[in-house]
Amino acid sequence: MKVTQIRQAYLDFFAQKGHQIVPSSPVVPGDDPTLLFTNAGMNQFKDVFLGFDKRSYTRATTAQKCIRAGGKHNDLDNVGYTARHHTFFEMLGNFSFGDYFKKDAIQFAWDLLTQVFELPKDKLLVTVYAEDDEAYAIWKDQIGVPAERIIRIGDNKGARYASDNFWMMGDTGPCGPCTEIFYDHGEHIPGGPPGSPDEDGDRFIEIWNNVFMQFNRDEAGVMHPLPKPSVDTGMGLERIAAVLQHVHSNYEIDLFVNLIKAAKDTVDGAGGENCDAQSPSLKVIADHIRACSFIVVDGVIPGNAGRGYVLRRIARRAIRHGYKLGARKPFFYQLVPALVKEMGDAYPELRAAQDKVSEVLKQEEERFFQTIANGMEILDGALAGGAKVVDGETAFRLHDTFGFPLDLTADVCRERGVTVDSEGFEVAMQKQRDQARAAGKFKVAQGLDYKGVPTRFHGYETLKHEGAKITALYLDGSAVNSVKAGDAAVVVLDNTPFYAESGGQVGDKGELRNEAARFTVDDTFKIQADVFGHQGEVLEGELKVGDTLNALVDIALRNDTMRNHSATHILHKALREVLGDHVQQKGSLVDASKTRFDFTHNAPITAEQIRRIEDIVNAEILDNSATSGKVMSLEDAQKTGAMMLFGEKYGDEVRVLEIGSSKELCGGTHVSRTGDIGSLKIVSEGGVAAGIRRVEAVTGQNALHFLQGLEDKINEAATILKTHPGDLVNRVAQLQESLRLAERELEKVNSKLAASQGDELAGQAIDVNGLKVLAARLDGADAGVLRETMDALKAKLKTAAIVLASVQGDKVSLIAGVTADSIAKVKAGDLVNFVAQQVGGKGGGKPEMAMAGGNDPSKLGAALDGVKDWVASK
């Protein structure tokens, strides 16, 4: 069976067993900041297992895209050199949310493996947790696995319940034993069974893990049985494919054979000259194109932090391996079509984003090949003057700032008989590791402990609700029965018109009051998905649990917020229309004063594009079309073509919002007609990260106030320049022309000065082995004068090596020049670095001309005096 057939057979089997086939969630988890990348099939169901989310089904099956290349789960360094490590892999899984348990889960697994996949029963071996007699009995008595092929695994990791066969989500929370199924590759493969001293060998390979969540562990470590036990399973698609295709390495399955062949072809085409088809580097490239492509599909752009940094590391590792094989121009991005051919049918989002993925990877590849060139230049500078060791800080700066791999630094140094201070590099690297944020571990939310009825939200229809009942009160994070005047507290109501912060829209403000008390609401947030907390202060009286009161939203603030939120939807649509369909929302903040919108785009937005975007949005506003919000199933919403955000978590039912030509899923509050927005003006645009742009815009009265402010500044500028506001542009143009003429006259003066100084300084040159050497100061000269003087001296001296210096305050400016006939002997970059290092600086440039700076003028005289001897030594 091919990989595509195995994947489908798994899903079909469980669909026939009453499971809902759930699409893979993105590899970038949009609703879990504790997780760098999706690394297991159960990630998208975490809130279901924790009881925070409910689905319309109790059985699910998935083929989940997973990444393990950052944080706790990091396989990057092993990829390409082992049979089973990957940065990207697919996890097949079936899940029970309080439905079936051990008996059915084990039976399902056995039937699929032995009947559908037709694996020999005597090739399968299972493990159970040592104390899980129930699972042991099911395997032995129901399934019929011989006792000698069932292995009990106890607490083998140094603590109670710390076992290969006991799974815990965290220090507290859901947990339980697991049973694992292993495939025996045969006696000819080294290695022992699980639990033996030789278990790390390759003979027995785990192919499936069934986790039985049956306990809730409290802070004291006590295990409490869960009322509805659940099942979480995972089987690596690549591993089971290797077993079914009778190969020992995952890289020998059909999918990887095809990708490795494509990798060889692209590397050969980029200069590899028939590279070794068995090279581990080709496995690295084939693996990494999967991880990089799916990360880009889900909206990540290469960068220097977080997920963007991980993406950059993976891509550059692949490019580095291509470079080792001889590639000298971009090749990696050319693998995207081959990947789409292998996986595009299973994951249509990959096929849809093919051009975008290719372009992003191509740009990164072009940058890295330039980085290699730049890194070589920096290395050349570090090795100038006969250095025999590249210090660890320099090697780490090349690695961390410029992306220049340490192994490439070591290769270059080795060729020149130079060593790298690897210990110093590790010290710098460890310092960075110590500062890095941990990622990848589940943490159960530590919110307010609320167990009452959910909050009913009425804020779409009204901004006032009478008779709301207090269901809970919190003071300093703890539940209390009452709060009094002066207390900063959180109030939970059974009914509210207050919108709780979510989807980028801030929470409502306002007031809660009855005849005896008054509470000002400064913010509204979600304690749970359907429980709203009203945060603020008791202004008068006392509030008690069970009291009823009137909830009054601040109308002016809500209306301004609604204008901005509705405008954001139209703005999003306009951005895609003007800039392209690659635009994806990466974040937003909507409050009463403005809307801030972050999105994917690789270049600044031009003034012309901003004007077009504004015109589109304001035209929609002037149309004054009615808006509508309809609640429907997620499946029906997808059929309408409503825009959905990558990584966003949606429930079974969603709200489809239509505003003008925009149609998106949104639970926020909005205007009734587009004309209610008034107008929109973009007030700023800029970059916030690599490949991420941000626009801020204002609407309604705020847009008017912004334009009035600009008008005031124009009038003030016109007054200063003694002209009418309507003639301001002409007046500025006149002043620019006057300035240009003055600068031209100054250039003429500087040229004459440089020529005269050149004539004067030329006589100070000293002959050193047939080369005229000059080192002189021109204090007060700027960079332009230094360059012109250098050109004049080179023309006059013909065969020369020259250093000129200028001091302004505590800053030293240096320029070195070498005539073309002398660069074989002396290079300007080496010469300027010789002087710069003595005055606390460094620099670089071309062999004929180089510049540098320093911050220690006191040593300049001695440095210039040493130029003659330095040239003589060459």
Curated annotation (Swiss-Prot):
Entry's Gene Ontology BP terms: alanyl-tRNA aminoacylation; negative regulation of DNA-templated transcription
Keyword line: Aminoacyl-tRNA synthetase, ATP-binding, Cytoplasm, Ligase, Metal-binding, Nucleotide-binding, Protein biosynthesis, RNA-binding, tRNA-binding, Zinc
GO CC annotations on file: cytosol
MF-aspect GO terms: alanine-tRNA ligase activity; aminoacyl-tRNA deacylase activity; ATP binding; tRNA binding; zinc ion binding
Pfam families: DHHA1 (PF02272), tRNA-synt_2c (PF01411), tRNA_SAD (PF07973)
Name listed for the protein in its UniProt record: Alanine--tRNA ligase
Entries under NCBIfam families matching the protein: alaS
EC numbers: 6.1.1.7
Transmembrane stretches, start-end: none
Cofactor note: Binds 1 zinc ion per subunit.
Chief location bin: cytoplasm
Cystine pairings recorded for this chain: none
Functional description taken from the UniProt entry: Catalyzes the attachment of alanine to tRNA(Ala) in a two-step reaction: alanine is first activated by ATP to form Ala-AMP and then transferred to the acceptor end of tRNA(Ala). Also edits incorrectly charged Ser-tRNA(Ala) and Gly-tRNA(Ala) via its editing domain.
